Amino acid sequence: MATYSTNEFKGGLKIMLDGDPFTIVENEFVKPGKGQAFNRVKLRNLKTNRVVEKTFKSGESVEAADVMETELQYLYNDGEFWYFMDPTSFEQKAAPSSAVGDAANWIKEQDTCTVILWNDTPLQVEAPNFVDLKVIETDPGVRGDTSSGGTKPAKLETGATVRVPLFIEEGEVLRVDTRKAEYVSRAKD
């Protein structure tokens, strides 16, 4: 099995600890005036999504996690599980709602998502960085009503709510940045 030394640690690296896959969120190299150097690392458990902090002595090695990031197409959900399909082999995978998390606000049927698999089980689903979604409900923008900064809430077809400019109307398709949950522009046809 592949291993990583502490000097190879960087954000996004996937490692195994205590039998669970973790991803490195933050890595800080510390060299005290006296004693051995060490790495203070923040890790996110990919199964539970909890963040833990751990220290590793400089030069220590850890096992690489056997996780795979793959592009899968979202099909449907039945309330408990979200079903994805591999577009090349047409093989389907069921991800629990806990693995989908906040991505549920942004994905609709037929969207392609990045899914992290461990032992062929989906652990985490990431929505595309930008999605085009239709506005299903928003207040009419009244001309001259800019005291609130010129934005209003709009409910999208997936159920998510974002702040949009006053000129946006119901039925329009918007481009949304899923990382910040922000309106970017009107979608181009």
Swiss-Prot record:
One of the record's GO molecular function terms: translation elongation factor activity
A Pfam family this chain is assigned to: EFP_N
Protein source organism: Halorhodospira halophila (strain DSM 244 / SL1)
Localization of this protein: Cytoplasm
Protein biosynthesis keyword on record: yes
GO CC term (a single one): cytoplasm
Pathway recorded for this protein: Protein biosynthesis; polypeptide chain elongation
Modified residues (N6-(3,6-diaminohexanoyl)-5-hydroxylysine): 34
UniProt-listed HAMAP family: EF_P
InterPro entries: Elong-fact-P_C (IPR015365), NA-bd_OB-fold (IPR012340), Rib_uL2_dom2 (IPR014722), Transl_elong_fac_P/YeiP (IPR020599), Transl_elong_KOW-like (IPR013185), Transl_elong_P/YeiP_cen (IPR001059), Transl_elong_P/YeiP_CS (IPR013852), Transl_elongation_fac_P (IPR011768)
Keywords: Cytoplasm, Elongation factor, Hydroxylation, Protein biosynthesis
Main function: Involved in peptide bond synthesis. Alleviates ribosome stalling that occurs when 3 or more consecutive Pro residues or the sequence PPG is present in a protein, possibly by augmenting the peptidyl transferase activity of the ribosome. Modification of Lys-34 is required for alleviation.
Name of this protein: Elongation factor P
Family: Belongs to the elongation factor P family.
Cross-referenced Gene3D superfamilies: 2.30.30.30, Nucleic acid-binding proteins
Chief location bin: cytoplasm
